[in-house]
């Protein structure tokens, strides 16, 4: 029973990308803040950043 894939809204993606551009690694307080702001779980934010860094690595 795998976890459901999260469908991020455009707004959420925009904010996450903006944050990523500014900072590739999040400290926990910031993660909590972003999760609350975007109505996501901390886990979702953490995983998004993890995946985004991998994608970033592949692109360079």
Curated annotation (Swiss-Prot):
Classification via InterPro entries: HD, HD_metazoa, Homeobox_CS, Homeodomain-like_sf
PROSITE patterns registered for this protein in UniProt: HOMEOBOX_1, HOMEOBOX_2
Gene3D superfamilies assigned to the protein according to its UniProt record, in alphabetical order: Homeodomain-like
Compartments, record wording: Nucleus
Gene Ontology MF annotations: DNA-binding transcription factor activity, RNA polymerase II-specific; RNA polymerase II cis-regulatory region sequence-specific DNA binding
Function noted in UniProt: Sequence-specific transcription factor which is part of a developmental regulatory system that provides cells with specific positional identities on the anterior-posterior axis.
Protein family: Belongs to the Antp homeobox family. Proboscipedia subfamily.
The protein's name: Homeobox protein Hox-B2
Gene that produces this protein: hoxb2
